[in-house]
Amino acid sequence: YHEWDEKTALDWYLAEEPQHRDLLKYYSDLLHIYQKYPALYRLDSDWNGFQWINANDGDRSIFSFIRRDETGKKNLLFVINFTPMARDDYRVGVPKSGTYTLILDNEHGLYKRGEHAFSKRSVKSECDGQPYSFAYPLPAYGTAVFRFN
């Protein structure tokens, strides 16, 4: 197949191949999540919509942050690994007690083995300057997004 070219039509037949089909599904799910979770677009220019959890893990190149909307009911926690090393039991700090449900994972979830339900209840264990935390198997070059209230 040829690279994208603004002068020609897209090679839609490629969407039938597994790798391309998975990428198309991933993009579709990203758009669905964007529409479903106002935390991704509301309060964009307001610090109330964003909170760093860990921006200082330079040794492992893993960053985590929270996006919020004005209701605080559909918060999203992002954990991103920028290295080729998987972290089997990565502990991430969270601001409150509750259940954190995986909604997007570019390694373990929706794009390789079908629906993947994963929820973790936070425990009272300080991490990243937060009073609660939970552990998650973070894949190499992986991004995990969790919803919580």
Predicted regions and their residues:
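Carbohydrate-interacting/catalytic domains
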Residues: 1-149
